[in-house]
A protein has these predicted regions:
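Sec/Tat signal peptide C-region and signal peptidase I cleavage site
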Residues: 18-26
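Bacterial N-terminal signal peptides
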Residues: 9-18
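N-terminal secretory signal peptides
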Residues: 25-82, 90
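Mature extracytoplasmic domains of secretory-pathway proteins
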Residues: 70-110
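Bacterial N-terminal signal peptides that target proteins for export
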Residues: 1-10
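Helix-rich interaction surfaces within compact, conserved domain-sized segments
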Residues: 96-155
């Protein structure tokens, strides 16, 4: 009886998590950056502009810095992170999160290093690496990148 109750509670919890709206930034309008900041309890560190895009930088309470790259049409085309913990990737990837999960699950066990992980899909590139207290990564949607911007511009 107790086991059945525990399983029911786990099932309800998973269903509730799956029902949450996607509030993440990747592929979303620049206004989602504010949503990310609130959802991650982060502070805006600054906004910078470069040729063809702007970068909004936020820092969560654990010290992880997240940069969200916005193209001239106001769409977030890339995110990057660096710090002692990984940020909430579901929050940052939004509608691309399931594509990321599917690609990650298709990688054979043992084929990817624990310290370095890469997903390369036609419309989603994710690179993540690190160890305890030193994580970094980036994700971008090539079709949303402004002309002249390269993956090297996303740090």
């Amino acid at each position: 009886m107790r086991r059945r109750f525990c399983l029911a509670m786990i099932g309800c919890s998973l269903a509730a998590v799956g029902a949450l709206p996607a509030l993440a930034a990747l592929g979303e309008d620049v206004s989602s950056v504010s949503t990310d900041r609130v959802q991650m309890h982060a502070q805006l560190k600054g906004t910078t502009s470069a040729a063809g895009f702007s970068v909004q930088e936020i820092e969560n309470p654990r010290g992880t810095v997240v940069r969200e790259y916005v193209n001239p049409s106001g769409t977030v085309f890339a995110v990057s992170w660096a710090g002692p913990s990984k940020p909430d990737l579901r929050q940052l990837f939004g509608s691309y999160f399931q594509q990321y999960v599917n690609a990650a699950n298709s990688v054979r066990r043992g084929a990817a290093s624990r310290r370095h992980f890469e997903v390369t899909q036609p419309d989603l590139i994710v690179e993540s690496n690190g160890r305890m207290r030193a994580f970094r990564g980036r994700a971008y949607v090539p079709s949303l990148m402004p002309p002249g911007v390269t993956p090297g511009d996303i740090s």
